[in-house]
Regions:
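Active-site-adjacent segment of SDR/Rossmann-fold oxidoreductases
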Residues: 143, 164-175
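Active-site helix of classical SDR
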Residues: 118, 154
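Conserved glycine-rich Rossmann-like NAD(P)H-binding loop of the short-chain dehydrogenase/reductase
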Residues: 28-42
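Substrate-binding pocket helix/loop in short-chain dehydrogenase/reductase
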Residues: 90-104
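C-terminal tail/cap regions
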Residues: 195-196, 200-263
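Residue(s) in the substrate-gating loop at a strand-loop-helix junction
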Residues: 138
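The beta1-alpha1 cofactor-binding region of Rossmann-like NAD(H)/NADP(H)-dependent oxidoreductases
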Residues: 54-64, 100
């Protein structure tokens, strides 16, 4: 697909998957706008693009990002909602063990960041006959991340919101792509060499996630799965839920015995 002079806006764009997305789109001719808590302005210089310090939990800042992008570069053709945060079950490692503040932050970033992006980017796209909205969720949004109930729950919500966008606006020209990787070599993995449970099927580079996303856009498929086994796991989860839950409990016991913590 030719992205020459297309405008691509990316949240969480200063590093990791977001930066890899920017590199992939720019290599195909796109103009790039990046937003992040820090580093966006510096990262955008590599693309002669727009960089903005922005927090997706603040409605006005998301609106400003859309407005500034369109004022500087033109109408947004592709919006990538990539900003995310990993909240675990610490300190108790009970499923309800995370603080209310951590649950709320996961909700505000992992779900509402996408909702606010759509709220402000989609109306203009609709007036122009359509656009592309990418939500970077996680395999945890289809399965579960052991030791991280807030992350799992809010990534499930992000997948559901992506589906809702497609159902509500697909007939109006909106193409929605939902990206659901397992382990990706980003800061979210921390210091773990093997990625812990997230790396059970191997760790991929952010560039691989970007390439799979571009392929999904070109092939007009809803899911972009950098780890293909995720599709099989989801099928098993849906068709054999009790077996899947039992397998996940067994896996949690194994991780706990090896590491003393589930993540």
């Amino acid at each position: 697909m030719d992205y020459t002079n297309k405008v691509v806006a990316i949240t969480g764009g200063a590093r990791g998957i977001g930066l890899a997305m920017a590199q992939a789109f720019h290599a195909r001719g796109a103009q790039i706008a990046l937003a992040d808590l820090d580093g966006a302005e510096a990262a955008a210089q590599a693309f002669d693009g727009l960089g903005m310090t922005m927090d997706v939990t603040v409605e006005g800042q998301v609106a400003e990002f859309v407005q500034k992008t369109e004022a500087a570069l033109g109408p947004i053709d592709v919006y990538v909602s990539n900003a995310g945060v990993l909240m675990t079950d610490e300190p108790s490692w009970d499923a309800a063990g995370a603080t209310d503040a951590n649950w709320q932050l996961a909700f505000e970033v992992n779900l509402m960041g996408a909702v606010r992006g759509a709220r402000h980017a989609w109306p203009g796209m609709r007036e122009r006959g359509g656009g592309i909205f990418v939500i970077v969720a996680s395999a945890a949004g289809l399965l579960a991340q052991i030791g991280a109930a807030p992350y799992t729950a809010t990534k499930h919500a992000a997948v559901a919101f992506a589906e809702s966008l497609s159902i509500a606006h697909g007939d109006d020209g909106l193409q929605v792509v939902c990206v659901c990787p397992q382990g990706v070599r980003t800061a979210m993995l921390g210091d773990s060499e093997d990625g812990g449970i997230a790396g059970v099927d191997g760790i991929v580079e952010p560039s691989a996630v970007a390439q799979v996303t571009l392929t999904a856009i070109e092939e007009k498929t809803f899911f972009a799965l950098p780890h293909p086994n995720v599709a099989d796991y989801e099928t098993m989860r849906a068709g054999q839920r009790d077996r899947w839950l039992g397998g996940m409990r067994k896996f949690r016991r194994k991780i706990m015995s090896e590491r003393g913590r589930p993540i």
